Amino acid sequence: MVVRVASIMPFLVMKGMALADRLKEKDPWDIYYCVRNYPGGLDALAEEVRPHARRGLVREGLGKIANAFASVDHIGPVSVADFEEVSDLEERAFLCRDAYEWINAMLERVRQLSARPDPTGKK
């Protein structure tokens, strides 16, 4: 099943802000799920975020996501495993690692793309 939102960029920013304002396990899980399952993969997601990546609110939201997923032991990956109610230690470690790697790969791809000039000429 695919649930469409208007755009991934405002969704990620909103969820990033929610990470700081409330502590619900579903917020990091939503971020992980959407990043991992985005149609077209990380490159398509990063291309959609790219035109907005220099805006203050977007940087703030992505920064809060980066903080929450700064390591496999940070609140982001741990909340993903908690939300899925994973109790097996090996499976839990794998899920935390997977969440950490997906989110950090997305953030790095956005950084790489936003460092290059926009081919459309937009700022």
Model-predicted regions and their roles:
Residues M1-K123:
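Compositionally biased terminal segments of proteins
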